[in-house]
């Protein structure tokens, strides 16, 4: 019985020693992240869609901060994100790059024609936000609440059963453009 307690104590002491060494090393050799990259990454929409030409939002933020990449390449974020980044970096706003120049693009969502889906899982592997569910050789479907409309699942599909369709506007999804609605003050009469 003493041998078991000695072994437990030895392993515990080793774990404590290695933990202390790793803790010291993580603080001693820590690499400071660029605070500008952190702030830009917080502004970006985190859709990880790759439409900017980078594999995700963090690499795009690093390219903006370190390599002087254009600030206008985030299609999902649109003009609002570009303006926030321009303000943060104190640079001139730029017109949106490429297809993102539409002022109010309709939100798109991937739709799978489930009758033609062969269950190859290529779309699941391509989706950066895990919005597609299904199993091998079984029907797949898209969870529209999670889909960012990034278009990355369309090309890998061998049966071409995936398409992007605009999301229908409902009272729940309607966004009022309060800057274009004419507003006037109506005087109120007080009656005694």
UniProtKB/Swiss-Prot annotation:
GO cellular component: plasma membrane
Occurrences of domain 4Fe-4S ferredoxin-type (ranges): 108-137, 138-167
Residue stretches making up the 4Fe-4S domain: 32-91
Stretches assigned to coiled coil: none
Flavoprotein keyword on record: no
Amino-acid positions noted as binding [4Fe-4S] cluster 2 in the UniProt annotation, renumbered to this chain: 117, 120, 123, 157
Binding sites annotated in the UniProt record for [4Fe-4S] cluster 3: 127, 147, 150, 153
InterPro entries referenced in this protein's UniProt entry, alphabetically: 4Fe-4S_dom, 4Fe4S_Fe-S-bd, 4Fe4S_Fe_S_CS, 4Fe4S_Ferredoxin_RnfB, Elect_transpt_cplx_RnfB/RsxB, RnfB/RsxB_Proteobac
Main location: membrane
Residues covered by region (Hydrophobic): 1-26
S-adenosyl-L-methionine is among the record's keywords: no
Family annotation (Gene3D superfamilies): 3.30.70.20, Electron transport complex subunit B, putative Fe-S cluster (1.10.15.40)
Database matches in PROSITE patterns: 4FE4S, 4FE4S_FER_1, 4FE4S_FER_2
GO molecular function, one term: 4 iron, 4 sulfur cluster binding
Keywords: 4Fe-4S, Cell inner membrane, Cell membrane, Electron transport, Iron, Iron-sulfur, Membrane, Metal-binding, Repeat, Translocase, Transport
Cofactor(s) the protein requires to work: [4Fe-4S] cluster
Family of this protein: Belongs to the 4Fe4S bacterial-type ferredoxin family. RnfB subfamily.
Role of this protein: Part of a membrane-bound complex that couples electron transfer with translocation of ions across the membrane. Required to maintain the reduced state of SoxR.
Protein name: Ion-translocating oxidoreductase complex subunit B
Gene: rsxB
């Amino acid at each position: 019985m003493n041998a078991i307690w000695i072994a437990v104590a030895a392993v515990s002491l080793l774990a404590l020693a290695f933990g202390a060494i790793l803790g010291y090393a993580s603080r001693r050799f820590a690499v400071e992240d660029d605070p500008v990259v952190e702030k830009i990454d917080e502004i970006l929409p985190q859709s990880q869609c790759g439409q900017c030409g980078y594999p995700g939002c963090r690499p795009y933020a690093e390219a903006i901060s370190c390599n002087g990449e254009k600030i206008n390449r985030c299609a999902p974020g649109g003009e609002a994100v570009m303006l926030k980044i321009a303000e943060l970096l104190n640079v001139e706003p730029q017109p949106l790059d490429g297809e993102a120049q539409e002022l109010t693009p309709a939100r798109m969502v991937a739709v799978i024609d489930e009758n033609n889906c062969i269950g190859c899982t290529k779309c699941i592997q391509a989706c950066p936000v895990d919005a597609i569910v299904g199993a091998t050789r079984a029907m797949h479907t898209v969870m529209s609440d999670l889909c960012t409309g990034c278009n990355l699942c369309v090309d890998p599909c061998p049966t071409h059963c995936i398409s992007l369709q605009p999301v229908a506007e409902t009272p729940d999804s309607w966004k009022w453009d309060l800057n274009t609605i004419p507003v006037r003050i109506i005087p109120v009469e007080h009656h005694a």
